Amino acid sequence: MARQEQRVSSERVGIFSSLVYPDYRRLWGATACSQAAVWALVVLRGALVYELTKSNVWVGLVTMAAQLPSLVVTPFAGFLADRCERRHLLAFTYGLNLGINLLLAVLVLTKQASEWPILVLAMFNGIIRSVEMPTNQALLPNLVPRERLLNAVALNQLMQQGARVFGPLCLLPIIRFVNPETAFVLSAVLYAIGWVQILMIRTASHGTIVAQQGILGNLVAGIRYIYTQPLMRSLMLLTLCHCALTMAYESAFPFVARTQLGLRAAKDLFEGPAYLMIGLGAGAVLGNLALARVGDQQRRGHLFLCLGVLSGLTPILLGWTTTLPWAMLAAAAVGASTSAFMTLSQGIIQTLAPDGIRGRVMSANTWHTQGAMGGFNAVNGLLMDVPWMTVPLLFGGTGMLFAVIMLGSVLMVHLRALYARGLPPEALAR
């Protein structure tokens, strides 16, 4: 009877039910601003570097520079997220990124920007983001009751992914009616607004650091936990493949705009990728809004498998579009499937991770996902400069490979149980 009541209650979760908690609402707003700033920079940096160098490789390198630092930084970031007061650490990262974005805007506006300074600043952005992301993920579960955690994660993912609409959408009028250089100021303004929101959070949040383990032992605690838990290990490897094969598309958007959509004018170089990013973000918003209403664990397990397969198939559709409206619709399908898949994955990992080491577990998660996306953005940049490479071949090959991996994952016992029944009750009861 109690289980039936719990199931009915979970199915009645409202889409925005977690926003009734003030500190979560502040974190949600700050996440919206920081992510919008990040996606605006992704569009602007890629277009500017291609304008300066006419090289897809450089676009891939700059995109990688913003993501690959997570391979080195995130283990230390997880340690910091469990050692320090999480809200204070998060505020510190927002302040640093605000300063870096202001510096980049000044360089661009004064015509001093070249590919090397842009790459170095992108790397510093990535280092700080590698601390910001696991700290955000470790703080979030302390701001809502456990029964609202999956809803809160879905809403947080809604903003993280849906900011791809807000950030590039704000860029378009500045690019069209002023100039692309002025648009760089937007990222700094958005980070400033987010920083104020973080400073208003009042809930204290700490992890647990074991003194006897030493710094190294505490650093690897999150990775050790993931790879000694069969379900976590399988889930992490699947998510790594997903990020590498279906989500490393940022460096490809200038290439898609030029070769597939025929957008070759000077401002089109900035506007084309912005429109594609808006399509992705719109799909991500719809996907996460739909997912936020799904409280039943069994349905979530079924959706996880279906969304994984769709994450591989939708990029194939995007690869064959030749007009901007259809490309935006296909990008929306990619955004809906990939972001909803990542929301479910992150929610499962956050639920399974003990509170005392959640920061280190989430940093290990970021380490895997950002490292995969950063590395494969660089690989895609190299591939796009190969004379015979086309968008259908690039997106079709990687997308089909992940769809096959996803279907093959049903052979793994722990994942098959997750697809069939969702998370086990003992995980939800902790």
Where are these regions (language model features)?
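Flexible cytoplasmic inter-helical loops of multi-pass small-molecule transporters
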Residues: 2-12, 148, 199-224, 419-428
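Helix-loop boundary and gating motifs at the non-cytosolic
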Residues: 9-68, 224-280
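Hydrophobic alpha-helical segments of secondary membrane carriers
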Residues: 30, 155-163, 238, 364-369
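Hydrophobic core of transmembrane alpha-helices in multi-pass small-molecule transporters
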Residues: 32, 114-131, 326-340
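MFS-fold secondary transporters
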Residues: 41, 50, 103-107, 125, ...
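Intracellular juxtamembrane helix-capping segments at the cytosolic ends
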Residues: 45, 131-144, 340-353
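C-terminal transmembrane bundle of multi-pass solute transporters/carriers
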Residues: 60-62, 72-76, 83, 87-96, ...
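Hydrophobic alpha-helical transmembrane segments
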Residues: 115-126, 151-207, 249, 271-282, ...
